[in-house]
Swiss-Prot record:
InterPro entries in UniProt: Fungal_Meroterpenoid_Isomerase, NTF2-like_dom_sf
Domain of life per record: Eukaryota
Metabolic or biological pathway, per its Swiss-Prot or TrEMBL entry: Secondary metabolite biosynthesis; terpenoid biosynthesis
One GO process term, biological-process aspect: terpenoid biosynthetic process
The protein's role, per its UniProt record: Part of the gene cluster B that mediates the biosynthesis of the fungal meroterpenoid acetoxydehydroaustin. The first step of the pathway is the synthesis of 3,5-dimethylorsellinic acid by the polyketide synthase ausA. 3,5-dimethylorsellinic acid is then prenylated by the polyprenyl transferase ausN. Further epoxidation by the FAD-dependent monooxygenase ausM and cyclization by the probable terpene cyclase ausL lead to the formation of protoaustinoid A.
Other information: In A.calidoustus, the austinoid gene cluster lies on a contiguous DNA region, while clusters from E.nidulans and P.brasilianum are split in their respective genomes. Genetic rearrangements provoked variability among the clusters and E.nidulans produces the least number of austionoid derivatives with the end products austinol and dehydroaustinol, while P.brasilianum can produce until acetoxydehydroaustin, and A.calidoustus produces the highest number of identified derivatives.
Protein name per the record: Austinoid biosynthesis clusters protein S
Organism: Penicillium brasilianum
Subunit: Homodimer.
UniProt similarity note: Belongs to the trt14 isomerase family.
Signal peptide start and end residues: none
Amino acid sequence: MSIRERLLATVSQYIAAYNEFDPSAMKTVRTPTCLSHGIAPTCKFTQSVEEHTRHMMLSRGVFRSVNASIVDDDTTVVDEVSRHVVVKVKIRCETTVGPYENEAIFIMAMDEEGALVDGIFQFLDTARFQQFQGRLDEAQESKN
């Protein structure tokens, strides 16, 4: 398998694990030192694997199903030398406050073998994310 094929296979495995929305599945495709970064100006964060696991566990109470898919393979960028892959992703979720859809750019840095994700930079459509966050806030306020 060429390095390009290996990198793309790792991206596919990451997306499959993302769709399971299970922290243990996510850990199988990430290095122990992998960091997740939100890079949108209104949605900035950096999480270690452990922090990401805690975040997912808390989010499981909100997300009933998650379906992420690569939007267009023609827009995927693979840099074999630096072991980076850039993909445009469509995310569809069923949540406790109804459907949530968003698009994102994932910039994924892989380990030397190209078999594990060593860092991921996510750029979400923040307008859609803020609308969803508003629905969550309204639902929480109506409970109080």
